[in-house]
From Swiss-Prot:
Residues 1-11 have a biased composition (Basic residues). This is Sal-like protein 3. In adult brain, testis and kidney. In lower levels also in adult ovaries and embryonic stem cells. In embryo in developing neuroectoderm of brain, inner ear and spinal cord. Also weakly and transiently expressed in embryonic branchial arches, notochord, limb buds and heart. The gene is Sall3. It is found in: Nucleus. Pfam families: zf-C2H2, zf-met. Residues 1-49, 84-166, 271-367, 534-623, 807-846, 878-972 are annotated as: Disordered. Belongs to the sal C2H2-type zinc-finger protein family. It comes from Mus musculus. The modification Phosphoserine is found at residues 109, 932, 1197.
Length: 1320
């Protein structure tokens, strides 16, 4: 016996709805009409002779048997067993309550509707099926229609008890989109409370049981019906060849074919209605009809002969369209392939059913896929209220046709749901109980449970759960494949493994050279159609036409659904497809019109392009097939297909649209939330019109404020400035985070003392202002009363102009602020130092002496602690030149700030680099110019920041080396001034007080060592990730990627991830060591320190003469440095001693010191030497009282702190005595006078802006330091060699090792490389 899984309360309702006499009269139900009415609930639809037990769903074709069974029926049986000789027509099993059903009918209908809100319509469908011709094909079923309304009174009594007595379970079988079945559990309490009506008598608990039973059965029936209708529609569409009219049963298919134009379920119902009508004559007719179709399918399988088998009464005569009925062979093939393609066939449903049986069985059954409810039926606020709707969402077909709420106005079955309670629960997820505002939202949500990802990228094959996600993803391919259009239609996942003749998987585009629309050709299932969808047979499946790769032939008007992303697009292909006059259908770049809403269905005249892969290889020739008869409208007629060299999608003309106006459908489309969502998604294609889209990089932001902030990454604008230090930030949040730096108090509230009057200050900014007052004569150089001093300090506001200018220098700083201060990385502000500074050729200038507030802090502290330590200063006098030159270069580079990449190409910079005077006005102007967005992208590739560092004569020894001076500690060995990244030695700094993940420089704690290592790059200025476009360096890959967005790079070049541009092994230290003291050009590629040896007088793009030493080695790597760095070649630097490989020459050089024992970086305070500058910096923190969190995010560059000190030398043991003030006052007065002069000149000229840096060189300084005007830039170059010979007065004074005048020496400073501690 065959197992009939029946869950539709429709049967119960339909029996109730259908008058017993109608049921008997129509279907020849055995037994009295009343009996039929009662039992008709089960047997009414389809063939009235069948009675279904409400408890166990058993089917009985004899009323007496049915009554006998009811006496002994138990709730346990969930499956109805149908006699083998009597194939239970799905319609009978699933009749839905008719709208006119009586209260009891409504109760059952409510149950049914709760099971599936659409079931109400299904009931109508059932009634229509029982009388289907009446509803749609009135020819055969005039009487059945009327019979439906009367049954309600008779039906009520039985359905209630039976329904309420049915067992209840928490588990129901439901179809998920891409799965055969799924188990859903419902709360029984909810269900119990959900049902009302006649069931109340039985008890609240009984109703949930009934509902659950019905749901389980209905789901199974829905699957069967869906498969049946799919096959039927496929057959009607594909086998629509003119032929002898089908016999009565075939006529029904013909009828359906007419309706298939709309491809709406009701059409399928009509198709089946014919057979049902025929079967109405005799109770056994329905099984016969069912068998008949099967018979048809069997012999016809594989054949394209028209369905001539007699499966139904001459009902077909009413519909000449039956000629379009699918050929049995096509039906068989379609049933097997299409059914499989669309959804797994239910075991209960024969895969190859003839069109007749499919139609007949389906015709009796309401279309479960469409939301259908009888207006008269009541829907309870039960979790199962919209079981049918959710079932649709879970059904594989539903994935394609998900958003169809509208119903053809001419089909009463599709009346809108009348229940006011339905809307809330009808979009409730049955798995997680979430409630959604629309069916489409629910269906999308269900994919999270099913894991279905129906949308496939036709370029890379990635799958997505929503079309919106696919659209967003597809934008990645737009730049590389602008000619390939996205496939907006769902591609069943099983097709990924289906071989194609072209070798390209379904849903994937052909190679770019092939037509844009090729993805259509490879898609077997383009449309998201209702229950009956024309699905293209896979190339391997025999079809009426050779559809090797052709898209499915489904009329555009087929979808009454609202425009879900899938269905709407399938509903009407983009208008561009209409341009088939040329014989080649052109698909518009985007299927935007598909989502238009009502217009979607209106764009019916469409012919999909036929690719050469199809049979005939001929392009689709015809345009619209407007002349086709209505029957042909459902599918391309054979003649039309033959006329087209290769089968093309049918072009549906307006006349067909007139037949299926879908007025109500359009309304639902317009109001559908899904359609709105679709329109938003479609706008992605038209995002140029998006008000929140960046016009530079086309990125769409969430809101105008986000867009405004985004533009700052392109313009470099930093509107939020710190009032204390002048730093500017792109966002207020970053500024607030930065304020924490100023709020942080030094560990012991270390006070900075004024070197002139010894007044203590806790704020370096106040100290700086105080010193300015000394210099300006506002305060005498003798200690003043505290009150007066502080009053003056308060009166002197921080120079606003200075802050303004400083804001232009924060790009470099901002990056660190993002990384450390605010942990927000504003990579757009990655610093690139485009300026040339020749520190080696000139003595340190006052601006370099007091270039930053932080330097002042450190300087004052060191002055207090080692003020009289002149001996050590004398020892370091030789190195002072180079050390101070380093300081100057660092300071100058630190001031670049916003100039970094934006004004790198500014002609003004290069022009002024050699001639601009160090004036506040110029520095301000320069900084403002650099801030202008216009200059932001002017990047002169030739203007590379170069720093020449003259290797000084051999320093006395490594122990005496400049604090952070990278110049060689060995006379003959020049050192690349490469800022080596901090090593893990930081983690074990001498103090040992910091945790392993605490920054040894700024004391900032981190969660892990990797984060700490990245953070150290902010101190070392290591920027290993170099942008190949503008050569800016970034400390992290993420920052680089962010930075690349400013270049509008969609596809990141491989060179983007190059590490620091490093010299080849030939340019590494060994080669440089050959010359005793070659002039070193320090190339800062976006903050990376690159040192190369310059040949004599190399021409530099900045127009600045590069000072050259007597013996210079021209580095062939200079030219490459002017171009984007080459792609990284991993580990190209080999250690000759141990064979280890390193990625950069600097790393190799540092490593080699482990073999040589070289420690070129000596602490000038305690004499301890270190192998790396970073280690020395960390060590210097042990000598600093103000090494507080306030210095967080700042890089400490200790540049020969002792050089500043003149006067009597102090023993090391005396450095840390407490009487610093007293000792400071013991210094020769001339020292402080010179110091004041230097400060006056430096601060008065806005030393923090250091226009010298902006100008790319050191302009003439009006200040005389130590008895001589600083030579102009030109003289600097020529005087490089003279620096040590004493020919240059300022340099001579610097080189003097005597302690005659400490003022002649540059002041010791702790300077942050490329950053000024206090200001930036």
């Amino acid at each position: 016996m065959s197992r009939r899984k029946q869950a539709k309360p429709q049967h119960l309702k339909s029996d109730e709805e259908l008058p017993p006499q109608d049921g008997a009269s129509e279907h020849g139900v055995p037994g009295d009409g009343a009996e039929d009415a009662d039992s008709g609930s089960e047997s009414r639809s389809g063939s009235e002779e069948t009675s279904v037990c409400e408890k166990c769903c058993a089917e009985f074709f004899k009323w007496a048997d049915f009554l006998q069974h009811k006496k002994t029926c138990t709730k346990n049986p969930l499956v109805l067993i149908v006699h083998d000789d009597e194939p239970a027509p799905p319609s009978e099993d699933f009749p839905e309550p008719s709208p006119a059903s009586s209260p009891s009918d409504r109760t059952e209908s409510e149950v049914a509707e709760e099971v599936a809100p659409t079931e109400g319509s299904e009931v109508k469908a059932a009634t229509k099926e029982a009388e289907p011709m009446d509803v749609e094909v009135s020819t055969d079923k005039g009487p059945p229609g009327p019979s439906v309304p009367p049954p309600p009174p008779a039906l009520p009594p039985q359905p209630e008890p039976a329904a309420f007595s049915m067992p209840s379970t928490n588990v129901t079988l439901e179809t998920l989109l891409s799965t055969k079945v799924a188990v859903a559990q419902f709360s029984q309490g909810a269900r119990a409370g959900g049902t009302t009506g006649a069931g109340g008598s039985v008890g609240a608990v009984a109703i949930p049981m009934i509902l659950e039973q019905l749901v389980a059965l209905q789901q199974q029936q829905i699957h069967q019906l869906q498969l049946i209708e799919q096959i039927r529609s496929q057959v009607a569409l594909m086998s629509r060849q003119p032929g002898p009219p089908l016999k009565p049963s075939a006529s029904a298919p013909g009828t359906a074919s007419v309706q298939l134009q709309g491809l709406t379920p009701h059409a399928a119902l009509q198709l089946s209605a014919g057979p049902a009508t025929a079967s109405a004559g005799s109770g056994s007719t329905l099984p016969a009809a069912f068998d008949g179709p099967q018979h048809l399918s069997q012999p016809a399988s594989g054949t394209s002969t028209p369905c001539s088998t007699s499966a139904a009464p001459p009902d077909s005569g009413a519909h000449p369209a039956c000629s379009t009925g699918p050929a049995p062979g096509a039906v068989a093939a379609a049933s097997s392939t299409v059914g499989n393609a669309v959804q797994p066939q239910n075991a209960s449903t024969p895969p190859a059913l003839g069109p007749g049986p499919l139609l007949s069985s389906a015709s009796n059954l309401p279309n479960p896929l469409l939301p259908q409810t009888s207006s008269s039926s009541v829907i309870f606020p039960n979790p199962l209220v919209s079981i049918a709707a959710t079932a649709n969402a879970l059904d594989p077909l539903s994935a394609l046709m998900k958003h169809r709420k509208g119903k053809p106005p001419n089909v009463s079955v599709f009346e809108p749901k009348a229940s006011a309670e339905d809307p809330f629960f009808k979009h409730k997820c049955r798995f997680c109980a979430k409630v959604f505002g629309s069916d489409s939202a629910l269906q999308i949500h269900l994919r999270s449970h099913t894991g279905e990802r129906p949308f496939k990228c036709n370029i890379c094959g990635n799958r997505f759960s929503t079309k919106g996600n696919l659209k967003v993803h597809f934008q990645r391919h737009k730049e590389k494949y602008p000619h390939i259009q996205m496939n907006p239609y769902p591609v069943p996942e099983y097709l990924d493994n289906v071989p194609t003749c072209s070798g390209i998987p379904y849903g994937m585009s052909l190679p770019p050279e092939k037509p844009v629309t090729t993805w259509l050709d490879s898609k077997p299932v383009l449309p998201t159609v209702p229950t009956s969808v024309g699905l293209q047979l896979p190339p391997t499946v025999p079809g009426t036409h050779n559809y090797t790769d052709s898209p499915s032939i489904t009329p555009v008007s087929r979808s009454p659904q609202r425009p879900s992303p899938a269905s709407s697009e399938c509903t009407s292909l983009s208008p561009g497809l209409n341009n088939t006059e040329s014989g080649i259908t052109v698909r518009p770049e985007s299927p935007q019109p598909l989502l238009g809403g009502p217009s979607l269905t209106k764009a019916e005249p469409v012919s999909l392009p036929c690719t050469s892969t199809r049979t005939g290889d001929a392009p689709v020739v015809g345009g619209q097939v407007s002349g086709l008869p209505t029957s042909a409208a459902t599918a391309v007629t054979d003649s039309a297909c033959t006329s087209l060299g290769s089968p093309g999608l049918p072009a549906v003309s307006d006349q067909f649209k007139a037949q299926f106006p879908f007025g109500g459908l359009l309304d639902s489309m317009q109001t559908s939330e899904t359609s709105k969502l679709q329109q938003l998604v479609e706008n992605i294609d038209k995002k140029m019109t998006d008000p929140n889209q960046c016009v530079i990089c086309h990125r769409v932001l969430s809101c105008q404020s986000a867009l405004k902030m985004h533009y700052r990454t392109h313009t470099g604008e930093r509107p939020f400035k710190c009032k204390i230090c002048g730093r500017a930030f792109t966002t207020k949040g970053n500024l607030k985070t930065h304020f924490g730096v100023h709020r942080a108090k030094p560990p012991l509230r270390v006070q900075h003392s004024c070197p002139i009057c010894q007044k203590k200050f806790t704020n370096a900014v106040v100290l700086q202002q105080h010193i300015r007052m000394h210099m300006g004569g506002q305060i005498p150089n003798t200690p003043l009363p505290e009150g007066l001093q502080e009053a003056m300090d308060a009166d002197l506001p921080f120079d606003e102009k200075n802050a303004e200018t400083l804001s232009s220098f924060d790009d470099d700083i901002d990056e660190n602020s993002m990384e450390e201060d605010s942990e927000l990385k504003d990579t757009a502000s990655d610093s690139s130092k485009p300026l040339l500074s020749y520190s080696g050729s000139c003595p340190p200038s006052p601006p370099s002496v007091i270039s930053s507030i932080a330097a002042l802090e450190n300087q004052m502290k060191m002055i207090d602690s080692v003020m009289n330590c002149q001996q050590l200063a004398n020892l370091k006098s030789v190195e002072n030149g180079s050390g101070e030159s380093d300081r100057l270069s660092n300071d100058s580079s630190s001031a670049v700030g916003d100039l970094e990449s934006r004004s790198a190409g500014s002609p003004a910079l290069s022009e002024s680099s050699s001639s601009q005077a160090l004036s506040p006005a110029h520095s301000n102007g320069e900084s403002f110019r650099s801030k202008s967005p216009g200059l932001g992208h002017q990047e002169d590739p030739q203007e590379i920041p170069l720093k020449t560092e003259r290797l000084d004569s051999p320093p006395p020894g490594p122990g005496n080396g400049g604090a952070l001076d990278l110049t060689a500690g060995h006379p003959g060995r020049p050192l690349i001034k490469e800022e080596a990244p901090f090593s893990l030695l930081f983690l074990s700094r001498e103090r040992g007080k910091c945790a392993s993940t605490v920054c040894g420089v700024c004391g900032k704690p981190f969660a892990c060592k990797s984060a700490l290592e990245i953070h150290y790059r902010s101190h070392t200025k290591e920027r290993r990730f170099v942008c190949t476009v503008c050569r800016r360096g970034c400390s992290t890959m993420g920052n680089l990627k962010q930075h690349l967005l400013t270049h509008k790079l969609k596809e990141l070049p491989s060179q983007v991830f190059d590490p620091n541009f490093t010299l080849g092994p030939s340019h590494s230290t060994p080669s440089l060591a050959s010359s005793p003291a070659p002039t070193m050009i320090k190339m800062e590629v976006n903050g990376h320190s690159k040192a190369i040896a310059l040949g004599e007088g190399p021409a530099l793009p900045a127009g600045v003469q590069v000072p050259t030493g007597p013996q210079t080695v021209m580095s062939p790597g200079l030219a490459p440095m002017l171009a984007p760095p080459p792609r990284r070649t991993p580990k190209q630097h080999n250690c000759q001693s141990c064979g280890k490989t390193f990625s950069s020459a600097s790393a190799l050089q540092i490593h080699e010191r482990t073999h040589t024992g070289e420690k070129p970086f000596g602490c000038t305070i305690c004499g301890r030497a270190f192998t790396t500058k970073g280690n020395l910096k960390v060590h210097m923190g042990t000598h600093m009282w103000n090494n507080a969190p306030a210095r967080r995010g700042r890089r400490l560059s200790v540049e020969n702190p002792m050089a500043l000190l003149g006067g009597d030398a102090l023993k090391f043991s005396e450095m840390f005595q407490k009487d610093l003030a007293a000792r400071a006052m013991n210094v020769d007065p001339s020292f402080w006078n010179q110091y004041a002069a230097a400060i006056t000149n430096g601060l008065a000229m806005k030393n923090n802006e250091i226009s010298v840096i902006q100008n790319g060189g050191i302009p003439q300084l009006p200040v005389s330091l130590g008895g001589g005007a600083i030579p102009p830039l030109g003289a600097m170059a020529s005087g490089v060699d003279k620096a040590r010979t004493g020919s240059s007065p300022p340099i001579v004074s610097l080189d003097k090792a005597s302690s005659e005048t400490g003022a002649s020496r540059p002041f010791a400073r702790f300077i942050e490389d490329n950053k000024e501690i206090g200001i930036n």
